[in-house]
């Protein structure tokens, strides 16, 4: 009887530790459903129906492994990826890494900020510039939560992630995708033409986020409670749950676009405004409004995550710190420039996702090297299988980027 009570008590304690350690992956996962995903997935679904769903599936599985490795690095070493690169690489390489990581973070933030501004424009009927001002104010307010510690921010961002997921459950109900072709698109790889390759690279860039690779290792490096092994096991659950939700949202985005647009003859839907306007007569005003609200939620939460990632990158690589509000103010500027110049915001969103795909390998190569180093990682070092899969992911990413560059230069369609 006594031993049974002890076992129950230890089991409850283990569950408490696991729950206490949940959260960082939800912050990371919000980066996987930013407005760049909306733009890329809608364009892919409208243009090719369900044919590119398999890209989302495989990209999400890759992202799960990558986020586990990133989180594991922080747990095992007490340092984030940027700090490890700074400590182990020559100074010119470190500066190169810092510059490209900042560019990637700014490209990400551009997509996220403009996406939220478009959401405000669609739902409230304001101008895009007014939507950008509302986005700026809202992100400043969310970032103020950081003063109270990491947990309150994790809860707010996790709540926004769940809101977007529920919104897309509703969108799927409205759009009623056909199950047979949807299932075929999930399991049978196909790239019909050059545009499909471009969009596949965009989906990859939108699904595997370089700035979040840096951020996740920072979110776990100061975790306390339980043993190192318990922290790692809790983190794996954290990643599995959060990334499954993010993966579902991405699949739902593309499937909804395919069902609502592609199979109703609207294959040219290529921007978020057009998607909103087309959804209303095809499905309902409620479906269009839910789309707009989910875009706002995704944009606000992901732009906050982008700001945090930029801070981690700067502090980690060059040991330089600026206040979060100042970084937020600086990184808003490109978005306002794009809006004031009247550039196509959705095209900017899709292009930013393609740019992101070029930063994946640069973040992933050192991550694999460090997490495969037994001296650094101890008992959490990568197994041979994980190393093999990791390098295969690098090869896939580099090959897709190479194909994209060659196709662009030669004008292949």
Curated annotation (Swiss-Prot):
Keywords: Cell inner membrane, Cell membrane, Ion transport, Membrane, Symport, Transmembrane, Transmembrane helix, Transport
GO cellular component: plasma membrane
The keyword Nucleotide-binding is annotated on this UniProt entry: no
Locations listed in the record: Cell inner membrane
Top-level division of the source organism's lineage: Bacteria
GO molecular function, one term: metal ion binding
Membrane topology qualifier: Multi-pass membrane protein
Xref: InterPro entries: NRAMP_fam
Pfam families per the UniProt record, alphabetical: Nramp
HAMAP family: NRAMP
PANTHER family: NATURAL RESISTANCE-ASSOCIATED MACROPHAGE PROTEIN 2, SOLUTE CARRIER PROTEIN FAMILY 11 MEMBER
Recorded family membership: Belongs to the NRAMP family.
Record function comment: H(+)-stimulated, divalent metal cation uptake system.
Name this polypeptide is given: Divalent metal cation transporter MntH
């Amino acid at each position: 009887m006594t031993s049974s009570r002890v076992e129950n008590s230890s089991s409850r304690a283990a569950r408490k530790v696991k729950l206490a350690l949940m959260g960082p992956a939800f912050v990371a996962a919000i980066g996987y459903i930013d407005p760049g995903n909306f733009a890329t997935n809608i364009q892919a679904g409208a243009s090719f129906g369900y044919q590119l769903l398999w890209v989302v599936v495989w990209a999400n599985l890759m992202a799960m492994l990558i986020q586990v490795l990133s989180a594991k690095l922080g747990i095992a070493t007490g340092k984030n990826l940027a700090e490890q690169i700074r400590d182990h690489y020559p100074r010119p390489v470190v500066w190169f890494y810092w510059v490209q990581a900042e560019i990637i973070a700014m490209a990400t933030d551009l997509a996220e900020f403009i996406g939220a501004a478009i959401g405000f424009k669609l739902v409230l009927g304001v101008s895009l510039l007014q939507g950008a001002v509302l986005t700026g104010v809202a992100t400043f307010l969310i970032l103020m939560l950081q003063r109270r510690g990491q947990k309150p921010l994790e809860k707010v961002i996790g709540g926004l992630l769940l809101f977007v997921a529920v919104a897309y459950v509703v969108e799927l109900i409205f759009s009623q995708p056909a199950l047979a072709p949807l299932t075929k698109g999930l399991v049978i790889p196909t790239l019909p033409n050059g545009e499909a390759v471009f969009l596949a690279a965009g989906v990859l860039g939108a699904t595997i986020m370089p700035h979040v690779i840096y951020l996740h290792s920072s979110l776990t490096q100061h975790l306390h409670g339980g043993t190192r092994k318990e922290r790692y096991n809790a983190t794996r659950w954290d990643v599995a749950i959060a990334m499954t939700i993010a993966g579902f949202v991405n699949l739902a985005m593309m499937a909804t676009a395919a069902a609502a647009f592609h199979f109703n003859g609207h294959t040219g839907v290529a921007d978020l405004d057009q998607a909103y306007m087309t959804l209303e007569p095809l499905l309902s005003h409620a479906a269009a409004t839910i789309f707009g609200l989910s875009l706002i939620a995704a944009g606000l939460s992901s732009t906050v995550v982008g700001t945090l990632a930029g801070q981690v990158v700067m502090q980690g690589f060059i040991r330089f710190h600026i206040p979060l509000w100042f970084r937020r103010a600086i990184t808003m500027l490109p978005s306002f420039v794009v809006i004031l110049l009247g550039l196509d915001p959705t095209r900017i969103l899709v292009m930013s996702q393609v740019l992101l795909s070029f930063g994946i390998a640069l973040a992933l190569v050192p991550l694999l090297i460090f997490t495969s180093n037994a001296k650094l990682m101890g008992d959490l070092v990568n197994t041979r299988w994980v190393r093999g899969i990791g390098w295969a992911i690098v090869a896939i990413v580099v090959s897709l980027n190479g194909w994209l560059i060659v196709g662009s230069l030669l004008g292949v369609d």
